[in-house]
């Protein structure tokens, strides 16, 4: 079997359970050495239990792979740097960062508290920015010393809630939409040193989605996290050097490349608000409607 990530060093945040665990296991099975990061928090971000990360690392080692445990908070500036430093100190390099850690604090906008907003934005958005920043800073130094592309990889995790919008998730959706935009911009910034940046929008049944809908056995099998990890593993490999700035949906029977916002119908600018309204009314029936959670037109 071809081992796509032979000799590469990957950091996976939130790798104790769910999607992150599957990513870590598949990366290791494909030859990567893995820093298994997980606080072991509850779905709402409270608590901590490093045993979940330890179990993933133990499973990697028992299968013949290499892994170390990291219990840092990925959304902490110092914690994110510790992850990068641990990879470099353990194996002399870091090649891949998979930003996967996340929490949920769902609430309708009118009922959402400041803490519920802040905690979700912190974990998802800063938890993507901080590891990416420290990895990019490391790669820039490596690039300057070698003069060669570093072939680094950042793989972020967005969501259909951020891409299409889901009621009751203004905090989560805003964070995930921010991650999609972050991905596109970071890809443009880091291309010159040989780093690719992509995002996965997974459709999978994990503890974070467990209570959202009732599923039969067939539906549950289609939502197994294992269907997402092959895309992550390929993007982590050197073979994916030419793929960057993309948002890719994976799971529930499909792999799909998402198409982002683009300008539709347009008209010349006007000074009169009534005329502006008339032009808007004229254009709106001509443009594509917003997508629903299934990626199809909704409103």
Predicted regions and their residues:
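Substrate-binding pocket helix/loop in short-chain dehydrogenase/reductase
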Residues: 108-109, 116-121
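Canonical Rossmann dinucleotide-binding motif of NAD(H)/NADP(H)-dependent dehydrogenases/reductases
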Residues: 2-36
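C-terminal helical subdomain
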Residues: 199, 218-299
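A short, exposed helix-loop element centered on a Lys and neighboring polar residues
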Residues: 132-133, 184
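Residue(s) in the substrate-gating loop at a strand-loop-helix junction
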Residues: 159
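The beta1-alpha1 cofactor-binding region of Rossmann-like NAD(H)/NADP(H)-dependent oxidoreductases
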Residues: 50, 54, 71-82, 114
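Active-site helix of classical SDR
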Residues: 20, 132, 175
């Amino acid at each position: 079997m071809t081992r796509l990530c032979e000799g590469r060093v990957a950091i996976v945040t939130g790798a104790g359970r769910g999607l992150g665990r599957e990513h870590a296991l598949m990366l290791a099975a494909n030859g990567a050495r893995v820093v298994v990061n997980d606080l072991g928090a509850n779905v709402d971000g409270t608590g901590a239990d490093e045993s979940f990360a330890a179990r993933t690392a133990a499973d990697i080692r028992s299968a013949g792979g290499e892994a170390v445990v990291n219990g840092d908070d990925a959304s902490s500036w110092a914690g994110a740097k510790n992850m990068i430093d641990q990879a470099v100190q353990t194996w002399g390099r870091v090649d891949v960062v998979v930003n996967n850690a996340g929490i949920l604090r769902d609430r309708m906008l009118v009922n959402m508290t400041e803490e519920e907003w802040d905690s979700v934005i912190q974990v998802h958005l800063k938890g993507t920015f901080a590891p990416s920043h420290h990895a990019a800073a490391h790669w820039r130094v490596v690039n300057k010393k070698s003069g060669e592309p570093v072939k680094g990889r950042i793989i972020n995790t967005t969501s259909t809630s951020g891409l299409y919008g889901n009621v009751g998730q203004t905090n989560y959706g805003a964070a995930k939409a921010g991650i999609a935009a972050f991905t596109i911009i970071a890809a443009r910034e880091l291309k010159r040193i040989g780093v690719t940046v992509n995002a996965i929008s997974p459709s999978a049944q994990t503890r974070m989605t467990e209570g959202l809908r009732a599923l039969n056995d067939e539906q549950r099998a289609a939502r197994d996290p294992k269907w997402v990890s092959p895309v992550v593993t390929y993007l982590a490999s050197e073979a994916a050097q030419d793929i960057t700035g993309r948002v890719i949906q994976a799971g529930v029977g499909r792999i799909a490349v998402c198409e982002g916002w683009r300008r539709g119908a347009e008209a010349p600018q006007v000074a009169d608000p009534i005329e502006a309204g008339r032009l808007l009314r004229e254009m709106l029936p001509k443009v594509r409607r917003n997508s629903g959670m299934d990626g199809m037109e909704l409103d």
